[in-house]
Amino acid sequence: MSGEIAMCEPEFGNDKAREPSVGGRWRVSWYERFVQPCLVELLGSALFIFIGCLSVIENGTDTGLLQPALAHGLALGLVIATLGNISGGHFNPAVSLAAMLIGGLNLVMLLPYWVSQLLGGMLGAALAKAVSPEERFWNASGAAFVTVQEQGQVAGALVAEIILTTLLALAVCMGAINEKTKGPLAPFSIGFAVTVDILAGGPVSGGCMNPARAFGPAVVANHWNFHWIYWLGPLLAGLLVGLLIRCFIGDGKTRLILKAR
């Protein structure tokens, strides 16, 4: 079973997994178009969140934020470089939202991507629990986000998550999707953005930037205190980045206003 699309039509996943067909059109198998990208998002999310959770659970007191910041950033850059050509390398519902808004992901794939990322988050967190000593796991609350302890911290944490995720989503959308600015260093830039964000924002909000990263450990450790912050903040940032690129900083093909005549 396969479908046919015009050569100029954007792909949902890997734009290289195509075969020439009759009349100058491309034939893409349903598996490569719909299923494979979702499997890759699940796999990449699981690997990234496993490494991230383990780095928090096994973090020593002498390393502070440096160990989780480097582990998250390097792991994300690695999985993007390895798997990004298949799915776009989002591994984050907020990034998928921003990518969809600027034309980097078809709308019909947004929900499947989200489901895949959340399942990957649960799998990665469960694997981190499986390989960790029980005492360390519970001392770290299963790598769930526990930075916000009281109502007075909520506003600062929410604003921090919006700003931190904006930087990350900009790194993805401008570095890997926008035609005028994308380049081969995108995986490095995206991973570096995560590292910088955690180092800077960790004491304020935990530096999540990713609902799947928050959701997986929350399920496994059953820790839901102030969990909504790590959904609302990143998703608002995804909307903001989509608006910025569509209206102001995107290339001529992406921008909806202020086009040259």
Swiss-Prot record:
One MF term in the entry's GO annotations? methylammonium channel activity
What activity regulation does UniProt give? Reversibly gated by a two-step sulfenylation-persulfidation process in cells undergoing diverse stresses.
Q: How does it sit in the membrane?
A: Multi-pass membrane protein
Q: Which residues are glycosylated?
A: N59, N139
Known SUPFAM superfamilies for this protein?
A: Aquaporin-like
What catalytic reaction does the record list? H2O(in) = H2O(out); H2O2(out) = H2O2(in); formamide(out) = formamide(in); methylamine(out) = methylamine(in)
For the Extracellular compartment, the record's topological domain ranges are 58-84, 129-156, 205-228
Q: What is known of its domains?
A: Aquaporins contain two tandem repeats each containing three membrane-spanning domains and a pore-forming loop with the signature motif Asn-Pro-Ala (NPA).
Description of what induces expression: Regulated by osmotic stress. Up-regulated in response to metabolic acidosis.
The protein depicted here goes by the name: Aquaporin-8
Q: Tell whether Isomerase is among the UniProt keywords.
A: no
Query: What tissues contain this protein?
Result: Detected in the sperm midpiece (at protein level). Expressed only in pancreas and colon.
Residues modified to Cysteine sulfenic acid (-SOH): C53
- What does the sequence similarity comment in the record state about its family? Belongs to the MIP/aquaporin (TC 1.A.8) family.
Query: Quick one: a GO biological-process term for this protein?
Result: B cell differentiation
Residue numbers covered by motif NPA 2? 210-212
Sum up the protein's function in the record's words. Channel that allows the facilitated permeation of water and uncharged molecules, such as hydrogen peroxide and the neutral form of ammonia (NH3), through cellular membranes such as plasma membrane, inner mitochondrial membrane and endoplasmic reticulum membrane of several tissues. The transport of the ammonia neutral form induces a parallel transport of proton, at alkaline pH when the concentration of ammonia is high. However, it is unclear whether the transport of proton takes place via the aquaporin or via an endogenous pathway.
